A protein has these predicted regions:
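Acidic (Asp/Glu) and glycine-rich low-complexity loops/linkers
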Residues: 2-73, 77-150, 156-168, 179-188, ...
Length: 264
């Protein structure tokens, strides 16, 4: 048992408090910087950049020659689905300098925005990001390759058909539905949930740092899943005996439960 010496001191009289000049000064400086920054933001080009980093857009290009799809978005929410008129459509809140073009069979979509905020004197602390919220519709065709890269945010991909696919995101949720991929479907995410529903693939290769992984569908190839923290659930429509004759399952989870279920 440790012995501590505690010296009780009896204080008499009244102790004079020192005026907190430093603390008050820092508050004044902080307020001045906040107000000054707001004035600067509201009266310079930075105002236009912060408030108009994203704009409402409705655009389209011909998709008849598209064989490969390459989409890059650094933050925000992106939905990718199927169009019904053979064109590529994009709509939503999108950076002013967005890229939407097809060249030599490759569709290039780039949506990049930087941090920004809006300053409102009536609501001083209503800070807002220039977040992207975009919908992209692709022709009803089978693409040689489909790739989408996102920095942070949500990515949803529905009703697509391709030979190979790669979905990458730094942090955020990935949702894939009604997806056909002849070869391996690759999904890489630093942190966030990965959910694949009603898919047919030639294999799956998922790598996630933290988050849950859920897959439901048919896999005609190897399964390779690496997750640091989180649960992993694979529900296959394949027959277990037939699958194990042809393919292998390699699942590595640092912390969390893993289960692989087959068609009964």
């Amino acid at each position: 048992m440790n012995n501590f010496n505690i010296n009780d001191k009896e204080f008499t009289g009244t102790k004079k408090r020192i005026f907190p000049y430093f603390s008050v000064g820092m508050v004044i400086v902080g307020a001045a910087m906040l107000i000054g920054g707001g004035i600067w933001t509201a009266t310079t080009d930075m105002s236009r950049y912060a408030k108009n980093g994203v704009i409402d857009v409705v655009d389209a290009v011909d998709g008849g020659n598209v064989e490969k799809v390459d989409i890059v978005v650094n933050t925000g929410t992106v939905y990718v689905g199927r169009s019904d008129d053979g064109q590529v459509h994009i709509e939503g809140k999108i950076p002013k300098d967005y890229v939407l073009k097809e060249k030599n069979g490759t569709l290039k979509v780039e949506l990049r925005t930087s941090f920004g905020f809006s300053f409102d004197w009536q609501d001083l602390f209503d800070w807002k990001y220039n977040e992207i919220d975009a919908k992209i519709y692709l022709p009803d065709a089978k693409f040689e390759s489909f790739e989408i890269s996102g920095g942070a945010g949500e990515i949803t991909v529905d009703d697509l058909n391709c030979v190979e696919a790669h979905i990458k995101t730094g942090a955020g949720e990935v949702s894939v539905n009604n997806f056909n991929c002849d070869k391996v479907l690759k999904i890489d995410t630093g942190a966030g949930d990965v959910k694949v529903n009603n898919a047919v693939t030639g294999g799956i290769d998922f790598d996630t740092g933290a988050g849950e992984v859920d897959f439901y569908g048919e896999v005609n190839g190897d399964i390779d899943i690496d997750t640091g923290v989180g649960e992993c659930t694979i529900n296959l429509t394949n027959d277990k005996a037939e699958f194990e004759k042809k393919y292998k399952v390699d699942i590595d989870t640092g912390v969390g439960e893993t289960s692989v279920n087959y068609n009964q």
